Amino acid sequence: MSGRLALVCHACALVLSASALRPLPAQSPADSIQAATLDKLKTVIASFEPARQIRWIRASGPFDLEGFYDNGLRWSSRLEIYITVTHQATIWLRVYPQYYGHHINVNRVHDPSGLMQQMLRFSYHNFFFWGLDDNLDAFAGYQFTLESGFPEESVKEVIKSIPLIDGSVGDLTPFILR
């Protein structure tokens, strides 16, 4: 009887351990494109001087880059930068200006309507578009498509332009302050 009990226990242990094992997912073609694009972005960041002025930190996602810029800003305490390489063969760049250490949230400003109108004007006239994320935090953004290959020179131009967002924050100040 004890031999059968041991056999049953071993069989149960084998079934339980086998059920906990999951096959590793195969890398999809989209993942390969994302990984190659991310490697190219990292190469630009490592070699392009304006990108090296941004302090890059460990990103939360496997195809994300995160950093912040705080050199010589007049209106923002710092600019938080998030770059995502998507499955749709695009690169998203989002820059969240911090005003006195906090994101500019439409629910916490003096004039939400005026802020949104000014952000729409910026989107029409400026290099970056402006928007709100799901938390209603304001950001300046840019989006690249990879249809014609990796846009290295365009990426450099956008990275070089990130500090200019600080001037737009100055234009938003009348709508932020209470």
Label for each model-derived stretch:
Residues M1-R4:
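N-terminal secretory signal peptides that target proteins for export/translocation
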Residues C9-S19:
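Bacterial N-terminal signal peptides
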Residues L24-R78:
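Charge-rich, low-complexity N-terminal segments
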Residues S28-A30, F48, R94-A138:
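Short, internal acidic amphipathic alpha-helical interface segments
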Residues Y69, V85, V95-Y99, D134, ...:
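A mature extracytoplasmic/lumenal domain signature
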Residues W75-I104:
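A short acidic-to-branched-hydrophobic micro-motif
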Residues L120-G170:
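A short, solvent-exposed beta-edge/loop patch
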Residues P174-R178:
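Short, highly charged C-terminal tails/helix-capping segments
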